[in-house]
């Protein structure tokens, strides 16, 4: 109980309890709304803590089994911290933009990753020295462009076991692809979202 209170206090201090304006709400979020204040919905942090703990336990089991959980956060305010956290735990991530087909067309995406890695190798081992300066510059630009989008999944040799979406509304394409392939999803849900769109969920 003490741990729950401590977590709830941290969420409160971080402003996690603030939802969207009432006029933007999704009625399916009613069970997770505590109150309304000045036209803004206040999220029930008791429910948030319950779902966070439930999701954390499920994610821990997936990671423990050696499977990969892919973190997705393309919103400007979340991308940096999410990529840092994903790198820290050696998990794949997508934080620049979701490349359509990243899951549903995974084999083709893997070919692009291999091309990126091949260019990186050429530039690193001196193979590119035989090229003209202009050709090397083009290669470097191509590599940088691909790395921005594909760098986070460079070591992902097969489809991830689960996705963690920082905002299921914003990452709806990733969510749709995961659902089509039966990949478990965990997501942060605001008061303007449909909480039934994903399997595991943390209502934030």
Task: Tell where the protein language model's regions lie, with residue ranges.
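N-terminal cationic and glycine-rich segments that engage phosphates or anionic surfaces
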Residues: 1-68, 74-75, 79-122, 133-136, ...
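Glycine-rich phosphate-binding loop
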Residues: 155-178
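Short His-Asn-centered micro-motif
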Residues: 72-75, 165-167
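Conserved small/polar residues in nucleotide/adenosyl-binding loops
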Residues: 202-204
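Nucleotide-binding motor/catalytic cores of P-loop/tubulin-like NTPases across gene-expression machines
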Residues: 170-198
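Short gly/ser/thr-rich secondary-structure transition/capping motifs
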Residues: 143-150
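Short hydrophobic alpha-helical runs that function as membrane-insertion/retention elements
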Residues: 69-70, 92-95, 164, 184-188
């Amino acid at each position: 109980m003490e741990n729950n209170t401590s977590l709830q206090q941290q969420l409160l201090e971080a402003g996690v309890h603030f939802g969207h304006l009432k006029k933007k709400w999704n009625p399916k979020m009613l069970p997770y709304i505590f109150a309304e204040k000045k036209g803004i919905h206040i999220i029930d942090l008791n429910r948030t803590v319950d779902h966070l703990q439930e999701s954390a336990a499920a994610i821990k089991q997936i990671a423990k089994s050696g499977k990969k959980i892919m973190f997705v956060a393309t919103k400007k305010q979340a991308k940096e911290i999410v990529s840092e956290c994903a790198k820290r735990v050696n998990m794949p991530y997508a934080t620049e933009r979701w490349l359509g087909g990243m899951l549903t067309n995974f084999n083709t995406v893997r070919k692009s990753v291999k091309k990126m890695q091949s260019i990186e190798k050429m530039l690193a081992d001196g193979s590119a020295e035989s090229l003209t300066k202009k050709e090397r510059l083009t290669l470097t630009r191509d590599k940088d462009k691909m790395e921005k989008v594909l760098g986070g999944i460079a070591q992902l040799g097969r489809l991830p076991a689960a996705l963690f979406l920082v905002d299921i509304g914003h990452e709806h394409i990733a969510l749709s692809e995961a659902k089509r392939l039966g990949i478990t999803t965990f997501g942060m849900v605001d008061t303007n979202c449909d909480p039934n769109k994903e399997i595991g969920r943390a209502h934030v």
